[in-house]
Amino acid sequence: MSAESCFGSSGDQSSSKGVATHGGSYVQYNVYGNLFEVSRKYVPPLRPIGRGAYGIVCAATNSETGEEVAIKKIGNAFDNIIDAKRTLREIKLLKHMDHENVIAVKDIIKPPQRENFNDVYIVYELMDTDLHQIIRSNQPLTDDHCRFFLYQLLRGLKYVHSANVLHRDLKPSNLLLNANCDLKLGDFGLARTKSETDFMTEYVVTRWYRAPELLLNCSEYTAAIDIWSVGCILGETMTREPLFPGKDYVHQLRLITELIGSPDDSSLGFLRSDNARRYVRQLPQYPRQNFAARFPNMSAGAVDLLEKMLVFDPSRRITVDEALCHPYLAPLHDINEEPVCVRPFNFDFEQPTLTEENIKELIYRETVKFNPQDSV
């Protein structure tokens, strides 16, 4: 995972000593106190490249293909049903997707023993870094860089939306990059079908990238929520600062209205709740800022597209297809090179009655599909 050519190195602290287990079919590694037990085809050095609430991610090499991969360990994956559903959802979704701008799942490591199946290891194609790291770095970003990132993000999102899926958690750290500046959407654990209109209680998407309709608990949200997030990401990539770093819901809405102006009554039609409409009307009123003055270092085309994404009323927000046709992206846009998903994704496996044990069995079956040769 050498990104020195474009992005600089993050150091190389690795774990190369493993202990063979289960007759040599698996190897255990200790990575900063974290136990990693993987199929023997994944060979060291194992290098930690990421960490989150779910666990840790290590880079390794698949000795059978010579390919470098990223292995995410989700420890005690079935202790919490919401987290377990999220893991299952991501596995199913990414298996369904096949697009240059969506991260690919290469393997779900089959556990040595079904009865002791508690940790899930998902193997992805390896990327060098993510957009959050690049924004925070000293790496110079030109308008062409930003345009290329945005184009790839929208190209991937067009495919995702065509599969009848909303990502719902787009943010710079979920946009993975390699040294060629290729971009891929990652982390589909919060994704939902477009037809699901219930407000998800476990919704934890980072507040800074959350659309107004979600901040206002609008239950019937659409693909427009992802476009709002794309606008936030575009602005942040250009300015190297988050557009709306709200401390809480109220502060978040205030930051939004300070930039795009307080909505008038005609922009509140998407709110079904009288209480929500009343709440918005009693908020402090702000005039719309001049975007060109607010973003002096952005090209006129980028500013115009940003204005069309950051629209309070989701029904008036630009769509992914319209955004791809915007003049700012004309140097890159080619509708024949922007494929859609052939089959819509089916979320029917997510029954309300699913138990932790059901989810464990469904994920176990996925490990067997990836590793049929290991099954008796």
Swiss-Prot record:
<dbReference type="InterPro" id="IPR017441">
    <property type="entry name" value="Protein_kinase_ATP_BS"/>
</dbReference>
<dbReference type="GO" id="GO:0004707">
    <property type="term" value="F:MAP kinase activity"/>
</dbReference>
<dbReference type="GO" id="GO:0009409">
    <property type="term" value="P:response to cold"/>
</dbReference>
<keyword id="KW-0493">Microtubule</keyword>
<dbReference type="Pfam" id="PF00069">
    <property type="entry name" value="Pkinase"/>
</dbReference>
<dbReference type="GO" id="GO:0016301">
    <property type="term" value="F:kinase activity"/>
</dbReference>
<dbReference type="GO" id="GO:0009504">
    <property type="term" value="C:cell plate"/>
</dbReference>
<dbReference type="GO" id="GO:0005524">
    <property type="term" value="F:ATP binding"/>
</dbReference>
<feature type="domain" description="Protein kinase">
    <location>
        <begin position="43"/>
        <end position="329"/>
    </location>
</feature>
<dbReference type="GO" id="GO:0043622">
    <property type="term" value="P:cortical microtubule organization"/>
</dbReference>
<dbReference type="GO" id="GO:0009555">
    <property type="term" value="P:pollen development"/>
</dbReference>
<feature type="short sequence motif" description="TXY">
    <location>
        <begin position="201"/>
        <end position="203"/>
    </location>
</feature>
<keyword id="KW-0391">Immunity</keyword>
<keyword id="KW-0547">Nucleotide-binding</keyword>
<dbReference type="InterPro" id="IPR050117">
    <property type="entry name" value="MAP_kinase"/>
</dbReference>
<dbReference type="GO" id="GO:0009861">
    <property type="term" value="P:jasmonic acid and ethylene-dependent systemic resistance"/>
</dbReference>
<feature type="modified residue" description="Phosphotyrosine">
    <location>
        <position position="203"/>
    </location>
</feature>
<dbReference type="GO" id="GO:0005874">
    <property type="term" value="C:microtubule"/>
</dbReference>
<dbReference type="GO" id="GO:0009868">
    <property type="term" value="P:jasmonic acid and ethylene-dependent systemic resistance, jasmonic acid mediated signaling pathway"/>
</dbReference>
<dbReference type="GO" id="GO:0090333">
    <property type="term" value="P:regulation of stomatal closure"/>
</dbReference>
<dbReference type="GO" id="GO:0006468">
    <property type="term" value="P:protein phosphorylation"/>
</dbReference>
<dbReference type="GO" id="GO:0004672">
    <property type="term" value="F:protein kinase activity"/>
</dbReference>
<keyword id="KW-0399">Innate immunity</keyword>
<keyword id="KW-0346">Stress response</keyword>
<dbReference type="GO" id="GO:0106310">
    <property type="term" value="F:protein serine kinase activity"/>
</dbReference>
<dbReference type="GO" id="GO:0009651">
    <property type="term" value="P:response to salt stress"/>
</dbReference>
<keyword id="KW-0418">Kinase</keyword>
<feature type="binding site">
    <location>
        <begin position="49"/>
        <end position="57"/>
    </location>
    <ligand>
        <name>ATP</name>
    </ligand>
</feature>
<dbReference type="InterPro" id="IPR000719">
    <property type="entry name" value="Prot_kinase_dom"/>
</dbReference>
<comment type="similarity">
    <text>Belongs to the protein kinase superfamily. CMGC Ser/Thr protein kinase family. MAP kinase subfamily.</text>
</comment>
<keyword id="KW-0206">Cytoskeleton</keyword>
<feature type="modified residue" description="Phosphothreonine">
    <location>
        <position position="201"/>
    </location>
</feature>
<keyword id="KW-0597">Phosphoprotein</keyword>
<dbReference type="GO" id="GO:0009737">
    <property type="term" value="P:response to abscisic acid"/>
</dbReference>
<dbReference type="InterPro" id="IPR008271">
    <property type="entry name" value="Ser/Thr_kinase_AS"/>
</dbReference>
<dbReference type="GO" id="GO:0016310">
    <property type="term" value="P:phosphorylation"/>
</dbReference>
<dbReference type="GO" id="GO:0010119">
    <property type="term" value="P:regulation of stomatal movement"/>
</dbReference>
<dbReference type="GO" id="GO:0005737">
    <property type="term" value="C:cytoplasm"/>
</dbReference>
<dbReference type="InterPro" id="IPR003527">
    <property type="entry name" value="MAP_kinase_CS"/>
</dbReference>
<dbReference type="GO" id="GO:0006972">
    <property type="term" value="P:hyperosmotic response"/>
</dbReference>
<protein>
    <recommendedName>
        <fullName>Mitogen-activated protein kinase 4</fullName>
        <ecNumber>2.7.11.24</ecNumber>
    </recommendedName>
</protein>
<dbReference type="InterPro" id="IPR011009">
    <property type="entry name" value="Kinase-like_dom_sf"/>
</dbReference>
